[in-house]
């Protein structure tokens, strides 16, 4: 009887975990598709006493189309490439945007410190069991931020929340020099219209691992409203023309990340940022050229 009960409990636990994993995977995949997207940010509370402190102005974008295309999908790893499609038939611009990788029960993290430095962290099993790591990458597939948490499915809602340090966002890094870390509290929630990316952020001036000052709070409301896939046809065409090059870029970065050691990057090399070489030049297309270019940005 005891043996039967033990086998039953083990079987029930396995079935339950597999059901939860399927719900998690379905939620992540619902972030794929063509979306009408708006980005909205506002600095809400000033926490510092700096005499000349100037808060950021509210940031709001007009709706744009964004293609979120799954470039890898298996049971424990989903990779989603985002591509912006801006403009209309008279003027159109395609922008390779961010990438998010979701890895189940991942133990390897790169945690942002400051000044383009990420510290490698190895999690023990109790800290990642049942969790998904979201790894977010810059437009050139260099690191941005990472965090591990559980997907929650309750009361008809599916969401994932995590707080982790990150570099300044693109909308701020060329304007603000008074803080160097954005402590991001992200919430990804699946909705009836698509999905929602909410943020409650802290703008941090970090001196070292002990000394830092929180200058202000910021909220972000990014809405991804699902539309017909053909609305993103130009973004998809661009990706089909360029995906082989970016597969090479990802593979080179994957080799770097697999070393599992701290990583420091130069902001520029010969006066240009990495994304400028990769996105705005036709010179870098094969493995050796791209590998040499990326290596020139790594501080050894």
Regions found by a protein language model. Name each.
Residues 2-13:
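Sec-dependent N-terminal signal peptides
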Residues 208-214:
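Short proline/glycine-enriched turn/loop segments at secondary-structure junctions
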Residues 72-153:
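Low-complexity, serine/threonine/proline-enriched polar segments
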Residues 18-28, 41-59, 75-82, 86, ...:
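Amphipathic/hydrophobic helical signal segments and adjacent flexible N-terminal regions
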Residues 55-72, 81, 99-101, 183-190, ...:
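Hydrophobic/aromatic beta-strand elements that line small-molecule binding cavities or substrate pockets
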Residues 31-33:
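A glycine-anchored, Pro-Gly-centered beta-turn/N-cap motif
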Residues 36-45, 83, 163-171, 198-206:
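Generic short beta-strand segments
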Residues 125-183, 203-205:
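Short helix-loop boundary/capping segments
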């Amino acid at each position: 009887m005891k043996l039967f009960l033990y086998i039953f409990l083990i079987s029930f636990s396995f079935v339950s975990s597999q059901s939860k994993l399927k719900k998690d995977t379905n939620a992540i995949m619902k972030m794929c598709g063509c979306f009408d997207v708006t980005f909205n940010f506002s600095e809400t509370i000033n926490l510092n006493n700096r005499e000349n402190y100037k808060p950021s102005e509210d940031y709001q974008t007009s709706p744009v189309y964004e293609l979120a295309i799954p470039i890898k999908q298996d049971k424990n790893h989903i990779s989603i490439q985002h591509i912006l499609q801006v403009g209309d038939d008279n003027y159109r611009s395609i922008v390779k945007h961010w990438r998010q990788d979701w890895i189940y029960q991942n133990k390897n993290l790169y945690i942002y410190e400051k000044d383009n430095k990420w510290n490698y962290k190895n999690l023990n099993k109790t800290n990642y069991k049942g969790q998904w790591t979201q790894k977010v990458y810059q437009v050139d597939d260099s690191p941005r931020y990472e965090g591990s948490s559980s997907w929650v499915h309750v009361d008809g809602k599916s969401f994932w929340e995590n707080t982790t340090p990150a570099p300044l966002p693109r909308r701020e890094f060329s304007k603000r020099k008074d803080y160097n870390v954005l402590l991001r509290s992200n919430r990804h929630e699946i909705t009836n219209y698509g999905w929602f990316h909410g943020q409650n952020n802290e703008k941090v001036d970090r001196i070292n691992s002990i000394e830092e000052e929180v200058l202000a709070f910021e909220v972000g409301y990014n809405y991804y409203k699902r539309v017909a896939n053909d609305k993103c046809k130009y973004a998809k065409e661009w990706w089909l023309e360029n995906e082989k090059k970016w597969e090479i870029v990802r593979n080179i970065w994957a080799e770097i990340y697999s070393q599992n050691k701290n990583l420091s990057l130069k902001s520029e090399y010969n006066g240009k940022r990495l994304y400028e070489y990769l996105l705005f030049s036709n010179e870098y297309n094969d493995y050796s050229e791209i590998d040499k270019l990326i290596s020139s940005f790594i501080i050894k």
